[in-house]
């Protein structure tokens, strides 16, 4: 991190010298006197004050810290002794491959000490945690998961609106409409990595072009029983929260309408949830559009069917 700005993907660095040496594990640990362990930690929605006490403690104790792009500089500043490795993934931008991230975690564990895998929000919600857990378990690495406040929770808290309500909202739907080229591939038979020899961490974290996504029409989604499940769940519940929907808002709109959701259903884009620059863009499903251009590239949630009547549009900066 330089002048409070997090490193780009592919960077291996120490924190600012004023807050720690960032040298990684001590020589005793690195020499193999104790096995390394990995903890998947939720960094919360953004506001550093929404970090859990346990998460803050582990970040401060970490020897290696492998973090996503959405983790705020104020959170990274808590890593007073860790070697920091940025492996952020952002839609449409070069990022580290998931397979490379898996190998980095294995290598850090082999080198000893505590590795914190820091993920935005909660590490078990749309964060590809299962792939990392599978690899770590297969290699015999001790692993733990520390939950975090999800962006969906923070969004509803910002609205002072419960996610469930007795007699009205009996189901809670968190979904993503994104479809990747590898989603239909059977990965069950693929061999899981074993503990690798030490590698060049900076080379392993090097960014590559963004992964290929399938751009499907609403008709294709509706015709596929598996791909339409997220939409069926929202229609059945009458409401839901969508992650990673900003680049496929047309498909979201058309799919929900095709499955019978009323066009007057309220919608609300929430951007930079929990941060001072948080923005809200209300609308209705029938005319749903992506967030304004001024908010493009920022983390956004789409709330469907749960917007309180007194929400007023927050103009984009």
PLM feature spans:
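Metal-ion/cofactor- or nucleotide/acyl-coenzyme-handling active-site neighborhoods
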Residues: 4-6, 16, 159-161, 166, ...
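Short gly/pro/ser/thr-enriched loop/turn and capping motifs at secondary-structure boundaries
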Residues: 72-74, 91-94, 150-154, 171-173, ...
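Conserved beta-alpha
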Residues: 145-152, 171-181, 306-317
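A contiguous loop/helix-start segment that scaffolds small-molecule binding in enzyme catalytic cores
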Residues: 2-11, 20, 35-38, 110-115, ...
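Class I S-adenosyl-L-methionine
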Residues: 1-20, 24-48, 53-149, 153-154, ...
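Acidic/glycine-enriched edge-of-secondary-structure segments
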Residues: 83-97, 172-176, 197-212, 240-242
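Short hydrophobic/aromatic-enriched beta-strand-loop microsegments
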Residues: 83-89, 140-144, 163-170, 260-269
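Short, glycine-/small-residue-rich phosphate/pyrophosphate-handling segment
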Residues: 156, 160-187, 214-220
């Amino acid at each position: 991190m330089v002048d409070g700005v997090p490193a780009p993907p592919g960077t291996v660095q120490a924190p600012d010298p004023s807050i720690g040496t960032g040298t990684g594990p001590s020589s005793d640990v690195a020499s193999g006197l104790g096995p390394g362990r990995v903890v998947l930690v939720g960094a919360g929605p953004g506001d550093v004050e929404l970090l859990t006490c346990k998460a803050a403690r582990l970040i401060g104790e970490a020897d290696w810290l492998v973090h996503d792009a959405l983790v705020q500089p104020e959170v990274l500043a808590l890593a007073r002794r860790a070697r920091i490795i940025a492996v952020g993934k952002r839609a449409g931008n070069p990022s580290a491959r998931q397979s490379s991230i898996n190998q980095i975690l294995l290598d850090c564990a082999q080198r000893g000490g505590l590795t914190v895998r820091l993920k935005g929000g909660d590490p078990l919600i749309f964060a590809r945690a299962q792939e990392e857990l599978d690899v770590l378990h297969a290699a015999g690495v001790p692993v733990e998961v520390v939950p975090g406040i999800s962006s969906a929770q923070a969004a509803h808290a910002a609205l002072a609106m419960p996610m469930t309500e007795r007699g009205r909202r009996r189901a809670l739907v968190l979904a993503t409409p994104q479809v990747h080229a590898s989603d239909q591939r059977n990965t069950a038979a693929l061999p899981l990595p074993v503990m690798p020899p030490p590698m060049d961490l900076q080379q392993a974290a090097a960014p590559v072009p963004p992964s290929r996504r399938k751009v499907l029409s609403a008709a294709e989604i509706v015709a596929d029983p598996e791909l339409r499940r997220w939409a069926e769940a929202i229609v059945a519940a009458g409401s839901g929260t969508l992650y990673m929907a900003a680049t496929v808002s047309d498909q979201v709109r058309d799919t929900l309408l095709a499955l019978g959701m009323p066009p007057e259903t309220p919608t609300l884009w929430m951007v930079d949830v929990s941060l001072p620059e948080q923005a809200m863009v209300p609308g209705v499903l029938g005319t749903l559009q992506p967030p304004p251009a001024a908010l493009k590239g920022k983390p956004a949630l789409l709330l469907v069917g749960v917007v309180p009547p007194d929400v007023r549009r927050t103009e984009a900066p």
